[in-house]
Amino acid sequence: MGELLSFQIFINEPVELLNLSLNAKAVLPEAAVLMAMLGTLLVDLAGEKISARWSPPICYAGLGSALILLAMQWDGEIQESFLGAFIADNLAIAFRGVIVLSTLISLLISWRYADQNGSPIGEFAAILLAATLGAMLLCGSTDLVSVFVSLETLSVASYLLSGYLKRDSRSSEAALKYLLVGSAAAAVFLYGASLLYGISGSTNLKEIGTTLLSAPTPLSALALVFVLSTVAFKIAAVPFHQWTPDVYEGSPTPVVAFLSVGSKAAGFALAIRILVGCFSAFDTQWKLLFTVLAVLSMSLGNVVALAQKSMKRMLAYSSIGQAGFVMIGLVCGTEDGFAAMVLYMAAYLFMNLGAFACIILFSIRTGSDQISDYAGLYQKDPLITLGLSLCLLSLGGIPPMLGFFGKIYLFFAGWADGQYLLVTVGLVTSVISIYYYISVIKMMVVTEPKEASDVVKAYPSIEWSIPGMSSLKVALIFCVLVTAIGGIISNPLFNFADSAVNGTPLLREAITLASKSSIG
């Protein structure tokens, strides 16, 4: 009888363990993206024509479902999955929402681009959805194993996307550089993770953090350096930025659009999970290191952008500077600081993807990426001129654009926390960035008709009836409208950012500890 009871317990325990590890509620948005990815692969097997017809609606359905499921999780009961290796708190939901929306807009602006370059649409969409899946899982990962698996899913898919234009040598070069540097970053992370596991005997970030608090060692500091290097690589912070300009210039433009927002959002989510949740014992040290990275990123990114001739390279260095601005919120470690990070990433999503939509449209019509070729564009294409101008002004932080409110919130949080150096550098470099943004606008608008570039003089007639152009137009207008009027009606975004912080136990604990230490 006792043996029978033991056997029943043995049978029941794995079932309970399986139910715990496969808590589907937490990962339903990821499941929707996964189903869309599998669907695009299946229709791709049926041939290019069927794939071109059905891949877009399948992607829209999957990503739209993911957004709805994320909205249903918002402010609800916090769910965990994969034996606690993934958590769906408000912070994870917010960053996953940014990533899904960035993928949706990237796909809207990519159909015509992929068709014109002769790239299979189904394969492209499936790989982009795989990268999205990895980025979403990374936002909620609370275990070193899940962090690494998610990170590599995102990275490998990104390498494939970067080299997707097989006939373009620059695309192949970008993929190779990205692969080599990314592999080195992954190896560095694994070494840091092995040190953390050796010190704590656990792969759970919270348990590692508890161990480091009770007994910090020199090896822990070394692990911090290795892990922080990987995080800095993912967000393209100086001096781990060398891959960014070449990859941005050589990769397909829709891929660059996704990497500049989706991949960066996942990187900042990873930074919060690991640095705040795992290295609270080294709070002063990692904040000092991030202060240095932020100053270098804001300074070098915006100064070097002044000398760029390619629009994509200019936005590459601009994105490095923008990462420096977001790091101000992370260094603060306050409620306003974390909320400002979330708000700015949401604002950056629209203004940056709006700019890339304009660049793609110009590239489709002219085949050019050179800034000088935009001279006199207002005469032939007022839509691109207006859209690109508004998005660049928002990136520069000009009121009343959405970017101004995001930037002012970051600077306010930094000043309130005593980060005077970061705020001062941020203000100075923002002025520098305004110069090169307005230089592009001036070239498009002020140039006399006779001084227009040869590319603009030979500008083709605008035809929106071509397949893939209508979705590009919708994405462009949507991003530009949100960028232009989002600042005027920014209260929902402020509430969204505050809820993301208040609905995340990890951040609430960090804020409480920070306030106690400041009082002490």
From Swiss-Prot:
UniProt subcellular location: Cellular thylakoid membrane
Keyword set includes Cell membrane: no
Entry's transmembrane regions: 26-46, 54-74, 91-111, 120-140, 144-164, 179-199, 220-240, 252-272, 288-308, 314-334, 342-362, 386-406, 421-441, 474-494
EC number(s) from the headed UniProt entry: 7.1.1.-
Pfam families according to UniProt: Proton_antipo_M
Reaction it catalyzes: a plastoquinone + NADH + (n+1) H(+)(in) = a plastoquinol + NAD(+) + n H(+)(out); a plastoquinone + NADPH + (n+1) H(+)(in) = a plastoquinol + NADP(+) + n H(+)(out)
Topology versus the membrane: Multi-pass membrane protein
Single GO biological process annotation from the record: photosynthesis, light reaction
Keywords: Membrane, NAD, NADP, Plastoquinone, Quinone, Thylakoid, Translocase, Transmembrane, Transmembrane helix, Transport
Its job: NDH-1 shuttles electrons from an unknown electron donor, via FMN and iron-sulfur (Fe-S) centers, to quinones in the respiratory and/or the photosynthetic chain. The immediate electron acceptor for the enzyme in this species is believed to be plastoquinone. Couples the redox reaction to proton translocation, and thus conserves the redox energy in a proton gradient. Cyanobacterial NDH-1 also plays a role in inorganic carbon-concentration.
Family (UniProt): Belongs to the complex I subunit 2 family.
SUBUNIT field: NDH-1 can be composed of about 15 different subunits; different subcomplexes with different compositions have been identified which probably have different functions.
Protein name: NAD(P)H-quinone oxidoreductase subunit 2
